[in-house]
Regions:
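Acidic, surface-exposed loops and disordered segments
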Residues: 1-168
């Protein structure tokens, strides 16, 4: 047991599942149901961000056709593990996230004008907070007993074109 385990307010098994044994997965077993996928998102959305914003968008890729299109956009080292995963999630962010202000911070609209006035600020804030939420997503995956294999080796412009053709 480490000092971190001794100081944690959650039990050691949870610390192990979320952190100590949570290495990036390269192989997967079992299935992920729609209910389990929803539970992952439900946990993710409550993680703290600036203004409690929720810019992260999760696109679950289940169909063989969609998965094949995604796999074609990945670097060679990521293709086999993505093809064999029971569920794949594309994590992106809503480029107009601040338009949902009343949903995540009702009654306190003053800061929204700051983001409406600066596309660069809105983009950087949305991107940064979506990265926080991506971390929460991985923690949610691990806390529900699943493996996670985050990756960055991909042609993201091709993924955007295929999965987000409207550009948002």
């Amino acid at each position: 047991m480490t000092v971190a385990h001794e100081e944690a307010v959650i039990d050691s098994a949870a610390v192990d599942a979320i952190f100590a044994e949570a290495r990036t997965a390269n192989a997967f077993t079992g299935e992920v149901t729609e209910q389990q996928a929803r539970a992952i998102y439900e946990l993710t959305k409550f993680g703290p961000t600036a203004f409690n914003s929720q810019p992260l968008r999760v696109t679950y890729v289940r169909s063989d056709e969609s998965r094949a299109k995604l796999v074609d956009s990945l670097s060679a080292g990521n293709r086999a593990k993505t093809a064999s995963a029971p569920l794949v999630a594309i994590l992106s962010y809503d480029t107009s996230w601040q338009e949902q202000w009343d949903n995540f911070l009702p009654g306190y609209n003053a800061p929204k004008a700051m983001y409406d006035a600066s596309a660069d600020l809105a983009a950087s804030t949305g991107n940064n907070n979506a990265h926080l939420q991506a971390g929460y997503f991985i923690l949610a995956v691990r806390s529900l007993g699943f493996a996670a294999g985050p990756m960055t080796g991909a042609d993201f412009a091709a993924i955007d074109k295929e999965f987000f053709p409207a550009g948002d």
